[in-house]
Amino acid sequence: MFVFVGSTVSLTAIVAAPVLTWIWANHLEPNLLKLTRLDWRLPKKFAHLHGLRIVQISDLHLNQSTPDAFLKKISRKVSSLSPDMLVFTGDFICRAKVESSNKLKNFLCSLNAPLGCFACLGNHDYATYVSRDIHGKINTIPETSSRPLRRALTSVYQSLFSSSHNEFAEEFTPQDPNPHLLSILHNTPFQLLHNQSVTLSDVVNIVGLGDFFAKQFDPKKAFTNYNPTLPGIILSHNPDTIHYLKDYPGDVVFSGHSHGPQISLPWPKFANTITNKLSGLENPELARGLFSFPQEKRLLYVNRGLGGWKRIRFFSPPEICIMRCLYEP
């Protein structure tokens, strides 16, 4: 009698691999929480920021499926980092729906920082959900006929076979911030900066921009009260907006939106290029990580975010970022 051990092992591996991948991507990695540590090397004129610790979180997309245990994990981790300042770069909710106002409020109230908590809005945070429609144009997406599969296929086709351009549908008009979300934020430690800037004790400017997809991105208005003698931290949900800020001041831009993207292949290089294109960004090379723009003397950090419409993650775990400000004479 012959026992084909090798064949049996191979068959088992073939069956087990996709099952284990599915379990990992749906149930394990979405609940991991990775910390990214960055250093901002300060020029002499900004030496007064030495030692400042800024924590960024982004893209929570809180909905009924967001586990309470995961929210507590985020809160504990942020607290353990002892941030001087906390920034949230948009997409508090999912598809313009506040599904659990108490859960969101309690989570946000569990976060704090002595210099303040600041936020901008993302494309999910307006009165109507804004994304790419079935033609690849930026448009409002009705809940009753969102056609997610067709929109996804259009997005994939555009990403792989043509360039994704930030083109608005002809009928699209600027969207107002979600009123329910605004009422929640009003009762939390977070100060929403919607095309606004604040100056903290003659130390630093904080600028928050409206979302680009919502047609609320207005840097001219946002920088009106900017103090050019001080450093500036800019919150802008969509990293594509970095190129619209060339004529404006500011030293560090925090963004999110792309989620990494949520399914990412770090190798081989061509696979990473393809998955980055699936982020839907006009500039897919900005899908995640730290970028330097020497001409503007500016840094951009694109956060992978914490959640998503679907809690699926593969080689792109949820992220908290901490940036230390360091001056070395």
UniProtKB/Swiss-Prot annotation:
Binding residues for a divalent metal cation 2: 91, 123, 257
Cofactor(s) required, per the database record: Mn(2+)
GO terms under biological process: lipid A biosynthetic process
GO CC entries: plasma membrane
Record field: catalytic activity: UDP-2,3-diacyl-alpha-D-glucosamine + H2O = 2,3-diacyl-alpha-D-glucosaminyl 1-phosphate + UMP + 2 H(+)
Molecular function terms from GO: metal ion binding; UDP-2,3-diacylglucosamine hydrolase activity
Keywords of the record: Cell inner membrane, Cell membrane, Hydrolase, Manganese, Membrane, Metal-binding, Transmembrane, Transmembrane helix
Metabolic or biological pathway: Glycolipid biosynthesis; lipid IV(A) biosynthesis
Family per record: Belongs to the metallophosphoesterase superfamily.
Protein name: UDP-2,3-diacylglucosamine pyrophosphatase LpxG
Species of provenance: Chlamydia muridarum (strain MoPn / Nigg)
